[in-house]
Amino acid sequence: MTNIRKSHPLIKIINHSFIDLPTPSNISAWWNFGSLLGVCLILQILTGLFLAMHYTSDTMTAFSSVTHICRDVNYGWIIRYMHANGASMFFICLYMHVGRGMYYGSYTFSETWNIGIMLLFAVMATAFMGYVLPWGQMSFWGATVITNLLSAIPYIGTNLVEWIWGGFSVDKATLTRFFAFHFILPFIISALAAVHLLFLHETGSNNPSGITSDSDKIPFHPYYTTKDILGLLALILTLMLLVLFLPDMLGDPDNYIPANPLNTPPHIKPEWYFLFAYAILRSIPNKLGGVLALVLSILILAMIPTLHTSKQRGMMFRPLSQCLFWLLVADLLTLTWIGGQPVEHPFITIGQLASVLYFSTLLILMPISGIIENRLLKW
């Protein structure tokens, strides 16, 4: 008799995805982030569900309902902080995952890569709308500033913004629809993640060497299930340290002030994980130009497979490209720092230089380094 996990129609899918999946024998801890992202998504859906049971999406009561969750609901404070800091952990894992894909040339799996970019946009949209829900000062002004960027679109911009707002300003209609979208998007993300995995399992995983590993595969379970548990424990430890000791470290103090349309905060800024894109937006004095740069800062990922000029897949044996990759990482950290600073000298200049470096590294320097490395191979 055949084992049930190999014969049952439903369990068979799980078996082929997580148990008997042929996996390269040499993948490192950088391949752990995919499973960690899955854990983050499940955690966010569960904590979000419990928060939604007590939250009210009305401008009059939203702020006090979040306060009520923290003060009166049984363990409401820990659920709220796990959800807020869970989003930060989600983005840390997400950026590491994308960075690993860029370093080891995983973008050559074009379908998997493109669905990954769609996932990134969906997660960013979800996080942005979630930040609006507590209806604090930064929630309100963040929503106003970011949605208002759409007015830069010629002809239809103003109508589009008013359509998204559901009125002539960010108000009750905006909050209600943002809550509805924030609730539904994680389920769309789950479906996209399933398609992401489907395409990945069509080709099999990449590995650090960048060479095909068909001749050297091992089953996912028990080898990588146990390896992933280590990463999972590290993730949970970091998250719980944040939640229990520094719950507000990554948040903005202004969001503890109820939203007031008549009082603008001194520095409007998004959550830390959007600061690099916000810095790129601010570095261009023109509104439409800034919006285009903002979108391109993420959409440029879709161009990476086209810009790949090297004969080697990953950067494992390409020191010049490695230097540029870590320059890009340092540049993104600089942009993140600049995004949180006020718009004044010298931060404006640093932001503009970092933005130019970001685009020139990806569009010009990396393709050139690939060509140079190809030439060096012939010597």
From Swiss-Prot:
GO biological process terms, semicolon-separated: mitochondrial electron transport, ubiquinol to cytochrome c
UniProt keyword terms in alphabetical order: Electron transport, Heme, Iron, Membrane, Metal-binding, Mitochondrion, Mitochondrion inner membrane, Respiratory chain, Transmembrane, Transmembrane helix, Transport, Ubiquinone
Signal peptide start-end: none
Pfam families per UniProt: Cytochrom_B_C, Cytochrome_B
Presence of keyword Membrane: yes
Sites where the protein binds a ubiquinone: H201
Free-text remark on how the cofactor is bound: Binds 2 heme b groups non-covalently.
Entry membrane topology: Multi-pass membrane protein
Record: residues binding heme b b562: H83, H182
Membrane-spanning residues: 33-53, 77-98, 113-133, 178-198, 226-246, 288-308, 320-340, 347-367
Cofactor(s) recorded in Swiss-Prot or TrEMBL: heme b
UniProt cross-references to InterPro entries, sorted A to Z: Cyt_b/b6_C, Cyt_b/b6_C_sf, Cyt_b/b6_N, Cytb/b6-like_sf, Cytochrome_b, Cytochrome_b_C_euk/bac, Cytochrome_b_N_euk/bac, Di-haem_cyt_TM
Compartment(s) where it occurs, according to its Swiss-Prot or TrEMBL record: Mitochondrion inner membrane
Matching Gene3D superfamilies: Cytochrome Bc1 Complex, Chain C
Binding site for heme b b566: H97, H196
MF terms (GO), sorted A to Z: metal ion binding; ubiquinol-cytochrome-c reductase activity
Domain of life: Eukaryota
UniProt function note: Component of the ubiquinol-cytochrome c reductase complex (complex III or cytochrome b-c1 complex) that is part of the mitochondrial respiratory chain. The b-c1 complex mediates electron transfer from ubiquinol to cytochrome c. Contributes to the generation of a proton gradient across the mitochondrial membrane that is then used for ATP synthesis.
Record text on subunit structure and interactions: The cytochrome bc1 complex contains 11 subunits: 3 respiratory subunits (MT-CYB, CYC1 and UQCRFS1), 2 core proteins (UQCRC1 and UQCRC2) and 6 low-molecular weight proteins (UQCRH/QCR6, UQCRB/QCR7, UQCRQ/QCR8, UQCR10/QCR9, UQCR11/QCR10 and a cleavage product of UQCRFS1). This cytochrome bc1 complex then forms a dimer.
Any further remark recorded for this protein: Heme 1 (or BL or b562) is low-potential and absorbs at about 562 nm, and heme 2 (or BH or b566) is high-potential and absorbs at about 566 nm.
Family: Belongs to the cytochrome b family.
Name under which the protein is recorded: Cytochrome b
